[in-house]
Amino acid sequence: MIIQVRSAALTYQSADGEVEALRSISLSMNEGEFCSIVGPSGCGKSTLLGAIAGLETLDSGSILVDGEEVRGPSPRIGLMPQRDQLFEWKTIQENVMLGLQVRRRDTPESRRRVAELLERYGLAEFAQKRPGQLSGGMRQRCALIRTLAIEPRILLLDEPFSALDYQTRLAVSADIHAILRREGQTALLVTHDISEAISMSDRIFILSRRPATVKAVRDLRELKDLTPLQRRDHPSFHIHFNAVWKELDIHV
């Protein structure tokens, strides 16, 4: 197992007092898997992702990556947040190099890898452009390449498509899914979009209302060889959707 979350519990202080965010959460992932976390709004999805990233401190329990306990931010873990967080005054190549520079890994070898990633994923001709000259989808691809450049063992994605319009969102999620499959990258996605989770994931972890627990796990490995768009047309897509929706127990 590349990720093991063992009985993770976490509380935090709010203006209204102590809030129990996570209650005895346990889950695991195999290397190369793409999994998603879904749950009701405000249930603690991003809090759990932050704990795995080493940005939140557990009250009890543990999180292991490659058998080593997570005690803070680690170069083994890459995080792609909701916004692309590109610096508008830097070129695309400079933006992609930032993570490596922060880690003091700006070497000829790392620069060659960045050049290869930009070429492989269609951004080489934009390397000297500014982020404002790119489409929303290309900006997200740039943000992904920046994260992949540090060669993380695990990639955490915190609703990275939420700022995109629907059509762009479909195209970019399919694009990023293909890149991660090609790279053999282990990835964990937080999303509020059930369809997005089904179209991209090998498994879905369904969280309960706060305090969050793992209420159910939906196995989608029968769809593993299909692209996100092909999955949306698959006969079982709506079966999976209805099953996840039922587990979420959302009343409208």
Regions found by a protein language model. Give the residues of each.
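Conserved ABC transporter NBD signature motif
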Residues: 61-73
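Helix-to-loop junction immediately C-terminal to a conserved catalytic motif
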Residues: 53
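The feature captures the beta-strand-to-loop junction immediately N-terminal to the Walker
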Residues: 38-40
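Conserved ABC ATPase signature
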Residues: 130-134, 138
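Short helical segment in ABC ATPase nucleotide-binding domains corresponding to the A-loop/adjacent helical element
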Residues: 93-101, 111, 115
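A short, proline-enriched helix->beta-strand linker immediately N-terminal to the Walker B motif
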Residues: 149-153
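Catalytic Walker B motif of ABC-type/P-loop ATPase nucleotide-binding domains
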Residues: 155-158
